[in-house]
């Protein structure tokens, strides 16, 4: 499999990212595929929505995971990296949408209210799925409310990015 990389919320719309999902042709099989981050703008007045709020919604189908070693956020002219306190990689909970006409396979990241470390910079962040929870998310085997939660305090380390992302190589 692939090495998790920083999840860059400023990535250009045309950039394809890797997601992990159940193979729609064989639900027993997991697959890693490339997908565009953002919904088809054809169905939303020309806007591609990259996020979907967790509150009040259920996601019974088309769940996927975005492997990440950290995520980035921009506040004013500064950019920050956010990574798990223990240095481990994680997944962002997401839902995928099939390719339609000229729009490729795509996904949207599910968001939750920001935890204390991130809330100093922004109100929300992607829902974090830990490695031990990945199959629970993909298989819908536990209530969504147990997985799509705001992480507790001291879950993240937030660092200002002064030049390119730094990370160790991690294996899936």
Segments predicted by a language model, with ranges:
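Short linear sequence motif anchored by a di-proline
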Residues: 1-172
